[in-house]
Amino acid sequence: MSDHRQLRVRFYPTQGQWMCVVQRLGADGMPEGEDAVSAVGATKEAARDAAIASTTDQAVIEALRAH
């Protein structure tokens, strides 16, 4: 199992939908670079499913499944 403690999963409401964003965090807890993945869906679950479908990074997938 991958260590996904250095990833932050967030959900934001936007224009009647939900956005799911996964960010990589540095040692200081601050986001590093661009988002690892982001996706939009009608529900949080749909946004999460879309984010999972848009990446092959196992650590990101595990972090998304944990939320």
Question: Which stretches of residues belong to each language-model region?
Answer:
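Short N-terminal "domain-start" leader segments
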Residues: 1-21
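Short intrinsically disordered terminal tails
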Residues: 1-2, 63-67
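A short, exposed loop/beta-hairpin motif centered on an aromatic-Gly-Thr core
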Residues: 25-49
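Positively charged, low-complexity intrinsically disordered regions
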Residues: 6-9, 24-25, 49, 66
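Short arginine-rich
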Residues: 52-65
